[in-house]
Structures are given as C-alpha cells and as structure tokens.
Amino acid sequence: MPERNHLLVVCSPKSLVLLVVLSPELLLLGTSLQLQDNAYEGLLVAIHPRVTEDQDLIPKITGMITEASSYLFNATKRRVYFGHVKILIPDTWKTHNYSQPKWENYEKANIIIADWYRKHRDDPYTLQYRGCGEEGQYIHFTPNFLLNDNLTAIYGSRGRVFVHEWAHLRWGVFDEYNNEKPFYMAGHNQVKVTRCSSDLTGIFVCEKNTCTQENCIIHNLFKEGCMFIHNNTQNATASIMYMQSLSSVVEFCNSSTHNQEAPNLQNQMCSLRSTWDVIMDSVDLRKSIPLDAAALPPPPTFSLLQTGDRIICLVLDVSGKMAEADRLLRLHQAAEFYLLQVVEIHTYVGIVSFSSKGLVRTLPRQIKNPRDRKQLSSTLPTTVIAGVGANICSGLRTGLQVIESLHGNAFGSVIILATSGGDGDISNCLSTMINSGSTIHTIALGPFVAENLEELSILTGGLKFFASDKSSSNGLIDAFSRISSGTGDIFRQPVQLDSAGEIIDIHQHFNRTVTIDEGLGNDTVFLVTWETHGPPDIVLQDPSGKKYFTEDFNTNPELKSSYLWIPETAKTGHWTCLLNNTHSSPQALKVSVSSRASDDVVPPVTVTAHVDKDETHFPHPVIIYADVKQGFYPILQANVIAVIEPEIGEPVRLELFDDGAGADIIKNDGIYSRYFFSFTVNGRYSLKVHVHQESHIRRLSKSIPRSHAIYVPGYIVNGNIQMNAPKKSTGDGDIQVQKWGFNRTTSGGSFSVLDVPTGPHLDLFPPCRIINLEAIRKEEEIILSWTASGEDFDQGQAASYEIRISKNLQKITDDFKNAILVNSSKMIPQPAGSRETFVFTPALLTKEQQQQLDGEMGEADKIYLAIRALDETSLQGQVSNIVQAALFIPGIAPSVPAREFLILKGVLTAVGLIMTLCLMIFVAHCTFSRKKKSRKKDNRTKLL
C-alpha cells in the first residue's frame, strides 16, 4: 500500500493541472427539505428519465411515503412525520396536467427512482459516506422494488423500508446487521447472532449443502453454511435499523435494548451508541416536541412536477477588471466550448453581458443543430468596457428578463454568472433571485470577487466555482464542463476525459495521452488553447496510428483556440496529443478532451467530487470526496488525485484513498476521500480531481453500497421454515476488465478558508481518529489491528499510540484518559495508511493494573479496548471506535438453538416420554398380575 506521507506535494509551475467532472448524485441535501412544526416539508422524489413510463409507479410512491409517515411518527415517539412531498416526473414521460418545477431537478432529489444496470437487483440503499450523525446523499429505490409486491416478503413493507433508509439519510445512523460477520463469539465461548436487539429469537439452519448431513451446532468455530432464521412472531420491539420487516419491530434500539457486543457498523462508527441516542442528538429531534397523545398527524400531501423546456442564460462580466490576466479571453473560450459541446440539444440559451448595467446580447434561442450553436457563440462578448465596475444585480435582473421573455416566468431556468468583481450589492437582489425559481451557478474569476457571491449559488441550489488567473489553468473550461442539465441522464451528457495545461518553453513539447474507453466515443472533441502568438504545431494520433495535424483543426486565431471533432465514433484506445511551441517565447498551452456515450445500455464511468463544507476556519480541515462509479456500481483500485488551487500561490496535489481509514468511512465503496488542511492564504480554493486506471484491472465492485435494507432469507412460521427466494448471485460477471483502462477529469467546485495565519505557526493538526480498530481473541492473546493515522490527520507518521482498557464500557467511553493504560512503548507507528497490529496479553499489565482491572465494575469475562494516536508535539487524536474481547473461555453450549438440535431434542424428548409411559404400563401390569395371583392363592387356601 502506498505511504500517505509521500503523497502531499506542491505543484511546480510546470505541473499538470488535472481536473474531473462532478456528477449529480453527490450534492448535499438542499435547504428545501426542512422540519417545520414536526413535519418534514419539501421532500423531493425524482424518477430517472430512463425509467419506463408506468402510471402505477406514482401511487406506489405515495403509498410508501404515507405508510412511512405513520411508522416514523410512532418510531420517534410522536415527534416527526412527513408533510408535503414533491414527485418529479421526467420529461421522457407523457405530458399531463403536472405543475412546473422551480429549482427541483433529479440531481437535487432526496429520493431517486432508477434502475440498476447489468444484473437486475432491487436492494434499497442510502448513499452514505460521512460520519456518525451526519446526513447521507440520497435514497435509491428501483422501479421493480416499488411495483413488485413479492419483494415485501424479502424486505418488509415499503413504508418500513423507507423509514430504515430515512434514518441513514437524515440522521446518519448505520445498519445493525453485518452480512460479513453474521455471528460473533461472546463471553463464555457463546456464539451469538449479530443483531439488535439480542432479544430477537430464531434458530440456526443449514444454508449450503456442506452441512446438510450434520447438525448445525456451533462450538468454538462457525460451520460454513450456517445461517440464522428469525421467528416471524416476536416480542422484541427493536430495531428498525436491524430488521424492520418483523411486525413486532416498531422502534429503534435505545440504551436499554441496544446490543453493544454486535460487530456492526453502528457500533463501529458511533462508538457503541444506540441508534436512538444518535437520533435524539440530531438537530431535528432536539427541537421537536412530541405531539399530544390525542393528536394525530395529517397524511402527507403530494404535488407532481414535470420539467419542460430547459432555459439557460449566460450572464457574463465585461467590466474593467475582465481585461486583467486575459480573463475575458479565457471566459470567451470556455463559454464557446460550453455552447458548442456541453449544453444539450433542444435547450434554449440566452446571453447577457454586464458592467455597470446589463445588456441583452441574444434572446433565448433553441439549439436544434450545430448551426444554432455557432450562431449563439458568435454573440459572446469580445471587448471590455474600460474604467467601469461590475453591477452584478443589474446583470442578474437583465438575465431574468431574458428568461421571462420566453414563458413569462423563470421557473426551472438556469443562470450561469461569471464575474471578476462586484460592488457588494448582491444583497439588493438576493431575495428576487431566490424567489424567481431560477438556479444560479457562480464562477468567480481571480482574487477580487465579491465575498458574498456564493450566497447566490447556495441559496438557489446552484454550483459555485473559482478560476484562478494562472495562464496554465483550465479552471474556466472545467467549470463550464461541469454544469449539466440536471436530468441525471449521463447518456445525454458529455464526459470530460482530460483537462491540463502547462507553460512550455521555446521549441519544447507538451504531451498528453488520453484514453477513450469502452462506452464512449460519440461527439468526441479535442480543444487546444494557447496564450500568445499563433497556434502551436499540433499532432494528434489515434489508436490505429492515424494522425491529425494543425490544419485539420478548426482554428480561431483571435480566440486563440483550435477544435477537432472526431467524425462518427472515435476509436477506443490511447490517443496521443503533442503540442509544440514553435514561437519565440514561452507560453501556456492547454488541452481539453470530452466525449459522449456510444452505448445506449451500459453507462460510462463517471466521477463526482466535492468537499464536505462550503467554508472552513483554520485550523479545521475540509474533507475531499470523489465518487468513482459506473452506473451505481463502485469502481475500485483507481488512482485518484485531487488538485487544490488557492487564489494566490501554487496548487497542491493530494492522493485520495478508498481504504476505510482516516476521512474514508467505508473501504471499497468507490468513495475516495482525504483530509485537506494545507491552507496557505485566506480566500477561495478550487477543487479539481483526476482519475486514472490502468488497463486489465478488475475494477467494478460486485457489491452494492452499504446502508441498505437487509435481504431476509426466510422466517420460522408456526414452527416451520419458510424460505424466500435466494438472493441473485452477482458473481464475477459484474466485474469488468477494461482493455484500455480509463481516465476522467472533473471540477469539484470551490470552498473558502478564513483565519489562516501569516507566517510560521504552531502545529495545530492532530492525528486523525482511528475508525477501524478490530480485536480478535487467539488463545490467551487479544490481537488488535487498525489502519495507521498520521502526524497530521491522515498524513505523515504518528509518534506513538495510547491503548487503554477497562471492564466498564462507560468508563472507557466517557473517561478514556483514566482507563488502564497498556504498555505499547515498544511499538513504532508506521506511515499513515499502513496496517498496524498489536498483541495484548495480561503480561503487559502491572500487578497494580491487574488489581485495578479486577476491581472494576463490569462483566468478568470481557474487556473493552480503545486507542488514539499522538504526534510529536503530543497533540492527541480522537479516541477510536471501541472494541471488546473475551477474557477467558470456559466452553459453554451456544445460547441460540440450531434447527437440527431442536429437532433432535424434540425426538429424544418424545422417545423418552414414550419409554416412560411404556415403563409405567409395564409396572402397572406387573403389579396387577401379582395382586391377581395373590388373590387366587388365598382363595385356594380357603377352599382347602
């Protein structure tokens, strides 16, 4: 595994700036979803445009949420329920009397209805990759899950499943089952089922042929093929995060019913806290007062929305500051690329320029063919109005007028605002823009843009970008490439493959190799831009060896750009692009490549990137996320590099990991993460991500995302086993081997940093929290293992570890520093990201510590352990997840009966009863016979 401390480097001026396209699913829950007077208002459900039209789907959705509202109300002790819900119908369905959406689109939905591709599967799940108590991204249901009533036997009623997933999404709790560890060893060598609560009953049965001829009774080792089947009738009322399908389960596990022993993700991520404790700590429930006993919540209300014409207006700054650093030229290059390549067909586009006031350059024009695209690009502004400032509100109001000229309102429209200044008057038009129903994407050019510019994006659900003045940066093109239609249909959207720039010396070359992988190749375009003079010498070679030269490109000398569209479908494989600076001085040369899907069934690989917050204050870090997937399947073993660029100074390159450590919550889920804290100046920072994977790598995970409803294999009904259909195998057929590999580039938007000190400062960055501590009992030893944290968060190498134990869970949870310290002084921490192992034995404790441990209140047969890392300045990381281990193993039979054991016990009991009855009859018969013979003897005596 790579050592993380070697992966943080500062780019030189000649370093390549590699960027990646942010996909829709990683937008956080919007401000539209709010809790008002105990009711969740503004929940958005969106149907993917590729879902086949079926009018039965809508009542299934409304029925599910109506049932969920009542179940949620009771599960939260009369605190919350669902109020108004919006259902967004795709434009691929027939038009009915639906309402027109405002800001709502598929990308912003809390609940998405979409098919998987390849193997048909219907597991409901929540995309959740942040910490305990933090919101997830979205809930995913398939159409078949909603339409096929047979699946309720497997997952439970849809309303109950919805509440299970809602707890993931809204409150950041985790599952209480564990498919990888369905059983665990408790004290006294007892085998227990990973469940919550532990009061749920059932039996062990054989799942596979390997144990059909023998009893599935488990002692020291688990037998392969054993599984646990629950009784369908239970007395236990918890827990919804374990098996909501059981009719008796109506609440979350609380502090009295929670199973802290179970090796599940809830215990690992939330430090053994119950789901109800985490939920009660949420903002929602802290401010919610239970309704009176006599009060009942009203049923949810629903509105149906359908997107109509897509309308976009470019609002472009031409004030005096746009003359600096070639800002207007670079903006023109990026806007033209957007119009010619990115914006989807049938979209209406208008263009406005502004300085002290707005100017209409073109009213909305629908794109029907390439001629419309060229006509629109010809109206882009080319000159700056010198000596005049930028009145952003004037430009925005003019943009609204252009949009409203088409249909009378701005509902569902998009404004792309690009500016290098601003006079601070944004507050004067903020409410107007919010109420307009238009989504505003903002692009800040250079270091002197109004500080509150991003409020326009945040409050209207738009994206925000920052483009530096570095001549080798492609930030503007990357920002425009990221802005999609919001429909979620990746088949209709361009995919950015590469974007890079470098300052090239005289007669030197700039080389790029771009891979066009399977599934792409339609509408492929290579864009070359330069800084000064004429175009460089261009040589582009396709995988078959065919070459394209400068004269094959469509060149605009004034715009300093050259395009080449590849006819039909571009060849799959490696394309090489060589740019030769033939001019008399160094200049910045840049290249961008994008393509569209060539396959209408298999989706292309996509990448999404963002940070966990819009703004941070030094020394608090941000977390960078990149979601790499094909359809909904995670891509593994990719090389993911984030490029973070400040307003002033050199960019920083940082490798992201999917290893389940540090900032990364779950291993192998396709979410690559890392802490970033190398702040050099105050202001805006841009995020760009580059993803690359070599050819012939097994890269597509066959697993579904975590945080999904459990697939119930069957139940015990009236003493009989009733099995559900076995879960469909995903097998290796879902794991794709790419002949050529792939590469992607995307923009992750921007974030702001405040309170960065000038000059040298003290080390304020502690090691990150260890989140994957594990304990395994092996004879008299307890083997601890975890992923190493770093000197600073998840980077570098920690100085030491502090391991403590206690028999009392409360003590190690609330008073870690006073728990018993284990001697780990001989252990030298490894670089961040490495696998650590430590063997604990009683010999490591002093006599006094052993006496202290023996005297602690708690169970005699188990101890709790936790760890934290320290750096060279003794800064302490947070305490890890808490694990437990058995102290001794007397060997007692399992606490849960096995199916065959129960059958054998019943047979033996019956045989015993029969034998006892036979013995009683025999004894009675013998006694009666003896008495009868005695009477006959007496009679004979008397006769004599």
Could you describe each region identified by the protein language model?
Residues L870-P897:
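Extracellular fibronectin type III
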Residues F141-V163:
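Short pre-active-site segment immediately N-terminal to the catalytic Zn-binding motif
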Residues L27-E135, L331-F337:
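Zn2+-dependent metallopeptidase catalytic core
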Residues Y155-E251:
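The catalytic-center signature of Zn2+-dependent metalloproteases
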Residues A798-A860:
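Recognizes extended acidic, P/S/T-rich segments that occur
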Residues G308-D489:
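Exposed acidic/Ser/Thr-rich ligand/metal-binding surfaces
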Residues E780-G796:
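Conserved aromatic anchor
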Residues L27, H258-L314, G320-R327:
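Acidic, polar low-complexity linker/tail segments
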